[in-house]
């Protein structure tokens, strides 16, 4: 355990966050996401919700400021519905740490899968919410 690191951030996830460069993307997936069939770098975060991970990551991770939307979530399939509280929980977790929230874009289901294939890694969580996946894009960490 390290001081200042959220307990939900595993050593493996901390290593991946440090390895990522600006513009790299990380998928935080729900428990139903086909992570192992679409990506070779999968980190398990069983029993931990996406909002909890977003809170921990937001303290360590600068979101990309040079794109319109550094967050991407899956659109509902036609005829299906989204629970707006899922996005609200995720943004509240980020806002708790950063004081503001980046913009979220909605991506068609299969386009989301294609984008996830090119991500730096996929973190499969214990999140049970339908359409509970989010892609986050890393930005440039400011020098202080």
Curated annotation (Swiss-Prot):
It catalyses: alpha-L-fucose = beta-L-fucose. One of its GO terms (biological process) is fucosylation. It is found in: Cytoplasm. It comes from Actinobacillus pleuropneumoniae serotype 5b (strain L20). The gene is fucU. Keywords: Carbohydrate metabolism, Cytoplasm, Fucose metabolism, Isomerase. Disulfide bonds: none annotated. The active site is at 22 (proton donor). Belongs to the RbsD / FucU family. FucU mutarotase subfamily. Pfam families: RbsD_FucU. NCBIfam families: PRK15420.1. PANTHER family: FUCOSE MUTAROTASE. This is L-fucose mutarotase. InterPro entries: L-fucose_mutarotase, RbsD-like_sf, RbsD/FucU_mutarotase, RbsD_FucU. One of its GO terms (molecular function) is L-fucose mutarotase activity. Substrate binds at residues 30, 109, 131-133. Pathway: Carbohydrate metabolism; L-fucose metabolism. One of its GO terms (cellular component) is cytoplasm. It comes from the Bacteria. Its EC number is 5.1.3.29.
